[in-house]
Amino acid sequence: MKVTAEKNEKVANMIFASIYPLYWNRLEKHGRTREEFHQVIKWFTGFDEDKLQRLIADKVTFRTFFEKAKIHPNAHMIKGVVCGYRIEEIEDEFDLYRQCRRMEKLIDELAKGRKMEKILREEKK
């Protein structure tokens, strides 16, 4: 599927705090811990626990969330299909949408029981 400017803007204006519990509920149902969830978010965004909780309390949008993030340099290694969108085919002009889908992919992998070493991608040496 193709990302549109309207879709990108809709996601950009969503409140992270309203989506966070949906992510967590999914992971909890699959027996994952909040620590694992936050480890994945920290790897991807650079947000420690305090910063993450402040962003949730401040009800920031996904736009602000990703503007403040320091996306991991290996994030480009997150590939695959999420909600019908192939991450690596999302155009550069929709980077925010791509980052949202990358984070969802990490959460999907965690929910499916993938090992943390595989989720937190490392360059092969």
Ranges and model annotations:
Residues 1-125:
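A charge-rich, low-complexity, intrinsically flexible signal that marks solvent-exposed coils, linkers
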